[in-house]
Amino acid sequence: MKYADEFRDKEIALGLAKAIRAEADPRKPYRFMEFCGGHTHAISRYGLEDMLPKNVRMIHGPGCPVCVLPAGRIDMAIRLAERPDIILCVYGDLMRVPGSQGASLLKAKARGADIRMVYSTIDAIRIAEDNPGREVVFFAIGFETTTPPTAVMIRLAGKKQLENFSVFCNHVLTPPAMQNILESPDIRNIGRVEIDGFVGPAHVSTIIGTAPYEFFAEEFGKPVVIAGFEPLDMMQAILMLVRQVNEHRHEVENQYSRAVSRDGNLRAKEEVSDIFELRDQFEWRGLGQVPYSGLKLKRAYAKYDAEVRFDMNELRVDDNPACECGAILRGVKKPVDCKLFGTVCTPETPMGSCMVSSEGACAAHWTYGRFRDHQQRRAS
């Protein structure tokens, strides 16, 4: 398949792996965080870590929007959905994300709450049109990639004069989270992680461009390479990071130039800035309160803001203390470091959000990595 098979060529991948081994200095570590959940999935799916020398380590960051959603926001959505006049529209990944005390949207639906899975923002608009006597709330979630469709949906609701439609906004931003990790490496008792460079997200960067990452190269001295999702994309990006570290450079390089530009999608960014504004702070699972990292609807669109419309109170709840999802999202621990992984916590019975989404580090390792763990234990 054109534009896919070319980036999965085995011989080229082996050549890139050989180049990384040749250029990585065995006397020092190379610690690179991939921020995008799609990259985490690709690394596990294609076994890329097995091709790297032991001193080149990939650290899984908080790049999965479902994974970083705090339990309190799930509880807020459940409370809303339990109202008899509400239809809550959500994406499928959200249904099993655990809230407090084992609660989830899926369990709330089983108890009778009218929670409907949708595949696009347009589906939610249609449900609102078909149910004029009910309040329809869309559970908006995602990074910069999925924010423009939500903005377009709100504008469309205005044009259609939908009075029974609103949005529970949970859109978050990538650069503030990256800054939080670099500025606050020690959070509670989770621990510290050293980072030598970033593999920048692909889809997010198609929207915001490469320019926002220049801050991290200039102020923190951390190289950033924007990469695509295919195995050759990732291997080339890692080689580019190794070379920057060896040459004591800290620049933003764009490996994914076939889809990403410096300025990004100007039309999409304008649409978002027209509808949304920054929150003073927003809670991330694993990171805590991150300043200016979340979006909310501007005052002009407040009637479409479910938190305003239904006077929703912010809920903050503690995560399961046995679950290491917070430390995994910060890159401090790996899925196998969690005592729950593969025992009581599986994709069928997730105890933490990292096991829910296919882009979560735990779900990716469960699907692709646990068999290698077993082989390594047998070999040892």
Curated annotation (Swiss-Prot):
A Pfam family: HypD
Gene: hypD2
Pathway named in the protein's UniProt entry: Protein modification; [NiFe] hydrogenase maturation
Iron-sulfur is among the record's keywords: yes
Similarity field: Belongs to the HypD family.
BP GO terms, sorted: protein maturation
Record protein name field: Hydrogenase maturation factor HypD2
Keywords, sorted A to Z: 4Fe-4S, Iron, Iron-sulfur, Metal-binding
Gene3D superfamilies: 6.10.20.100, HypD, alpha/beta domain 1
Residues the record lists as binding Fe cation: 36, 64, 67
Species this protein is from: Bradyrhizobium diazoefficiens (strain JCM 10833 / BCRC 13528 / IAM 13628 / NBRC 14792 / USDA 110)
Molecular function GO labels: 4 iron, 4 sulfur cluster binding; carbon monoxide binding; iron ion binding
Cofactor: [4Fe-4S] cluster
Protein task: Involved in the maturation of [NiFe] hydrogenases. Involved in the biosynthesis of the Fe(CN)(2)CO cofactor.
